[in-house]
Amino acid sequence: MKIQFLFVLLSSYLCFGQNKTEKAIMLYSIDQYIKPVYNLSTDAALELASRISKAAYTKNKNVSIVLLDASRTTVLRMRGNGVGPHNTEASRRKAYTALSTKTPTLLLLRNSEKNPDTKNQNSLPELLLLSGGTPIWYKGEIIGSVGVSGGGSPENDDWIAQSASIPEIGITTTK
């Protein structure tokens, strides 16, 4: 008898517990929450590295190259023969700086020297205000960045980094 009484008592909770009395919250369309992002692929990184190496070769230089995708993930990292190991980390930080600021690092360096309010940007831990970093663009969107070190001069590093383009398909270092 006690079991039947408990069953009757609890069955009402089970039946009425399933009623939904809350109103549904109106959500925005999916486009308000999720955006597609172009990203640098491994194949593109390999092609860019080949073009960068050829540009460095025309200046008789071996360089370290780091390519990051739009989410700051390292897609490719390579060090030319005879290039010091510190150059590879410098290349990564140049690429990070270019990606983070969406500005070539040589331009960023020169602009920060002119403006006392931005001169302390070099004190931020990951930013490296040395030439040789540049963002990589596709259809007006940043898809990654490149950092180049070991070119022998700031102008060489910048010029070599600017060669990270595949204009045939719209990948360039200019917006």
Give residue ranges: language-model regions.
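Bacterial Sec-dependent N-terminal signal peptides
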Residues: 1-20
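Flexible, solvent-exposed loop/hinge segments and secondary-structure transition points
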Residues: 19-175
